Amino acid sequence: MKEGKFTFEGTVEQPLLYGLATEEMDWPAQLFLENVPMEVSMTKEGESLSVKGSAVNDLFLGNAEKVFAPGFSIDSLVSQYPDNPAAAFYLYRYFTYQLPLDQLKATRAKLAPALASSPYVQDLDAIIARLEKVQIGQVAPDFSLPDTAGVSVSLADFRGKYVLLDFWASWCPPCRRENPNVVKAYEENKDKNFTIIGISLDNNREKWLKGIADDHLTWTHLSDLKYWDSEIPALYGVRAIPSNMLLDPNGVIIAKDIREEALHETLREVLK
């Protein structure tokens, strides 16, 4: 760098998001690299980032805050810029699990075929494929995880019972707030061919076990202690917790993300 300026040259296979950082920055500034001349300016601290000469960055930086605003329509963005990788990125990164599956698929279908090789689109397609397998009416995919004693337990072991798969973690405040409600549901229905399997996204065994004890969670608990790197949340399309699924005795998903009073109402209807 000389007098606050530098240049670099190269090519990329396709536009992707990269980080640009200085020693003064706590976190890299994000921008897309594409095969066009670009002029980038920002402070040493990473503030006031601007990029000239890049249509992808025009869309990316121009919507960096808008995507979080109430009323933002990702469908409108994709419809207007179907061949822009930044639109595909925003759909994948922020709306994959916010949109109902049918709406997600409809918006995905509006992306230009030229973006099919984008890793954002490929990851989005993989997520859609997983979500299609865990919709209401589908048989929940089997899995095995260690319990609190380190013994491998499979979902198939519970076939014949109504099962609530409860995704949570000891570090998750909303999960901990919901736990008393789940405890109440368990105590009221545990003698009605109903049980709960807690699947934790913890990565610390001691904190996991302490959370179970502190919240009086007396049902089966499983975790590979891999945090979000666990394969099971991905298998079930879980990207935020708390999350749950209610399975019938045949392992068919009959309800999803039922919390607070909705949990009790659903169980009363199903277990009557």
What is each residue range found by the language model?
Residues 1-80:
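A non-transmembrane, solvent-exposed segment enriched in polar/low-complexity residues
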Residues 38-40, 49-51, 57, 68-139:
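N-terminal targeting signals for export/organelle localization
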Residues 122-155, 219-220, 266-268, 272:
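N-terminal "domain-start" segment that seeds a small globular fold
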Residues 159-160, 167-184:
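Conserved redox-active cysteine motifs that mediate thiol-disulfide chemistry
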Residues 192-206, 217-228:
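Thiol-based oxidoreductase modules, predominantly thioredoxin-like and allied folds used
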Residues 217, 224-270:
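Thiol/disulfide oxidoreductase modules built on the thioredoxin-like
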